[in-house]
Swiss-Prot record:
This is Store-operated calcium entry-associated regulatory factor. It comes from Mus musculus. The cytoplasmic C-terminal region mediates interaction with STIM1, while the N-terminal lumenal region mediates regulation of SOCE activity. Negative regulator of store-operated Ca(2+) entry (SOCE) involved in protecting cells from Ca(2+) overfilling. In response to cytosolic Ca(2+) elevation after endoplasmic reticulum Ca(2+) refilling, promotes a slow inactivation of STIM (STIM1 or STIM2)-dependent SOCE activity: possibly act by facilitating the deoligomerization of STIM to efficiently turn off ORAI when the endoplasmic reticulum lumen is filled with the appropriate Ca(2+) levels, and thus preventing the overload of the cell with excessive Ca(2+) ions. Residues 32-168 are lumenal. Residues 1-31 form the signal peptide. Interacts with STIM1; the interaction is inhibited by the interaction of STIM1 with EFHB. It is a single-pass type I membrane protein. The gene is Saraf. The lineage of its organism: Eukaryota, Metazoa, Chordata, Craniata, Vertebrata. GO terms for biological process: calcium ion transport; regulation of store-operated calcium entry. Disulfide bonds: none annotated. Residues 313-325 have a biased composition (Polar residues). It is found in: Endoplasmic reticulum membrane. Residues 190-334 are cytoplasmic. Keywords: Calcium, Calcium transport, Endoplasmic reticulum, Ion transport, Membrane, Signal, Transmembrane, Transmembrane helix, Transport.
Length: 334
């Protein structure tokens, strides 16, 4: 009897040792000691990037950040990095709070953290680095207000920004200066040969004509010959600028007074428009008036059309206003 009692514990030890040996062999094969196998409840925080993908074991990798819809749409704004913090266990799964800097026109809608289960979609353990965030991007009240305003004036706003963009300001300035220089040349410096002489009721060599011509004097060097020529305006004759403008008004086919007037008007419009803010910009920058004099000979001069500090072309280069936005959601295993 004593021998039988001693033999039973030895017989029980053999199955236990065999089971322990099997566990030691099968454990690593099942991934129990794999450092990539982690309990999701132990994860405190996730930092996710828009240009990176998750790790994968059973399935294909997915983007760490993925927009899946919302009232604003996925093309409206793309956050570069989002951090999600573990806020606790609700009895079913981990709950998350995700934060990032968003434009004030947008906010998070529905958010969910998606992780790859290590063995299956029901596994409490997940693959390390396999978590990503799926989110909706919605408009805030301010964003909806801006959307309605831009919808009413979309055509004019697009045209205004294209016309006064930083790329087009330099070209427009050069073109206007070229037209203005050409108009001045044709108006004052070019001695046209094809235009008929100005009409006068007196013969060109009469005493009346010669008297006024001598009173006007010779034209300045480089100016038109008819710059000071006689012209009948109803009060006798006129000279100087009156004659120059009057002479162009009688049948002259070349550019003259009207081309100069048009070029001046265009230049004035350009200068005036550049001082005005865009009609739908909330953060337009108005440069301060320049000082009355400069303290040094090489100090930067104020230029309303330049590209230096305090100068601008009408373009959307103002920094957009942002604030920290939060989204809340649970977990989905895949």
């Amino acid at each position: 009897m004593a021998v039988a009692a001693v033999g039973r514990p030895r017989a029980l030890r053999c199955p236990l040792l065999l089971l322990l040996s099997l566990l030691l062999v099968a454990g690593p094969a099942l991934g129990w000691n794999d450092p990539d196998r982690i309990l999701l409840r132990d994860v405190k925080a996730l930092t996710l990037y828009s240009d990176r993908y998750t790790t994968s074991r059973r399935l294909d990798p997915i983007p760490q950040l993925k927009c899946v819809g919302g009232t604003a749409g996925c093309e409206a704004y793309t956050p570069r990095v989002i951090q999600c913090q573990n806020k606790g266990w609700d009895g079913y799964d981990v709950q998350w709070e995700c934060k990032t800097d968003l434009d004030i026109a947008y906010k998070f809608g529905k958010t969910v953290v998606s992780c790859e289960g290590y063995e299956s979609s029901e596994d409490q353990y997940v693959l390390r680095g396999s978590c990503g965030l799926e989110y909706n991007l919605d408009y805030t009240e301010l964003g909806l207000k801006k959307l309605k305003e831009s919808g009413k004036h979309q055509g004019f706003s697009d045209y205004y920004h294209k016309l006064y963009s930083s790329d087009s300001c330099g070209f427009i300035t050069i073109a206007v200066l070229f037209v203005l220089a050409f108009a001045v040349y044709k108006l004052f410096l070019s001695d046209g040969q094809g235009s008929p002489p100005p009409y006068s009721e007196h013969p060109p060599y009469s005493e009346h004509s010669q008297r006024f011509a001598s009173a006007a004097g010779a034209p300045p060097p480089g100016f038109k010959s008819e710059f000071t020529g006689p012209q009948n305006t109803g009060y006798g004759a006129s000279s100087g600028f009156g004659s120059a403008f009057g002479g162009q008004g009688y049948g002259s086919s070349g550019p003259g007074f009207w081309s100069g007037l048009g070029a001046g008007g265009l230049l004035g419009y350009l200068f005036g428009s550049n001082r005005a803010a865009t009609p739908f910009s909330d953060s337009w920058y108005h440069p301060a008036y320049p000082p009355s004099h400069s303290g040094a000979w090489n100090s930067r001069a104020y230029s309303p059309l330049g590209g230096g500090a305090g100068s601008y072309c009408a373009s959307s280069n103002a920094d957009s206003r942002t604030r920290t936005a939060s989204g809340y959601g649970g977990t989905r295993r895949r």
